[in-house]
Amino acid sequence: MTDTDPNFRFEGTFFETLGIRIVEATRERVIADMAVRPELMTIGGRLHGGALMSLADSIGAYGAFLALPQGAAGTTTIESKTNFFAGAAAGEVRGEATPLHIGGRTSVWQTRVTQKGKLVSLTTQTQMVLMPSPPRPERA
């Protein structure tokens, strides 16, 4: 990976551990693929719900990061809800995160995860905008 590859910034992170690969990333949409590997599956042979939620949270948070207002220090998830519609078998899933709201203090993102065009899960998450802490006064 190079620093022009959008996946470069995720080297050595949970994002990389999950095997998430960014396909497209703008403040209006983030698309990513994730391989459904044995270590992410349940004993029933389907992608674990926690892995689905982690994919959705990761790419929704990245979209929120890209949409941060000027001067913001970062973003963090403050609420997340996921509905599961189908199991995902071995292969690959695709997540597409889009904003429902982008404000000065929060943003709300919705992520659809599909496999071969079939809806697997739908996550809605709220991201809080983190502002830099004011400098602390020095003690005498």
PLM region spans:
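Terminal targeting signals and extreme-terminal segments of soluble enzymes
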Residues: 1-140
